[in-house]
Amino acid sequence: PVEGRKMRRSSHALIEDQSDLDTDCHTASELFEAFADNKEWDVISFAHCGGRYADITKAHDGRFEKSVEVHSAWGTFEWIVHDAFKNGYRVGIIGNSDGHKGRPGASYPGAGWFGAIGGLTCFLMPDLSRNSLVECINTRHHYATTGGPSGRMRLEVSMSFDEPATQYLDDPLLAKNCTTKPCSQAMMGDIV
């Protein structure tokens, strides 16, 4: 990812500097359009839920949004995964705290009505670097848990093929010239 890009906000409420109002993106669709217009293909974006139903079909763009949030301090949202798969989206699944306190997996519930302990995401990365994290997100090599004391687990899912298979390095429904490679094995998140 490139540093120093324009900050795009959904609002300038409570922000004194109003000099960049023209970069505001009031909807997710506007945000994805701005990314595409500026050829910012390496951004990371997740569909986040604040405890209430959100229709992922209104703004999902698989070029930028590689995962959806299934759990946070606001509850568990399995419906977003069902909606994504029903619509043919190839997404990974993440869990977050949404606690804003820097306590992954140990945040307080978001609200009494639909609150829960914050979730966790396990990223299956070869090393702890920004590039590995971005690659892990883009290839959906991650999974979510509901957090808490029992939510810290390591899970690996893989398969082997009896015959040669083809792995797509991106969603072939989104990329016109999607790069492929032959494979005899695949892991969680791979598109074969």
Segments predicted by a language model, with ranges:
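C-terminal functional module detector
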Residues: 49-59, 64-66, 78-192
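Short, glycine/acidic-rich beta->alpha junctions
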Residues: 26-27, 75-76, 85
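Surface-exposed loop and adjacent secondary-structure segments within mature catalytic domains
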Residues: 1-72, 104, 110-114
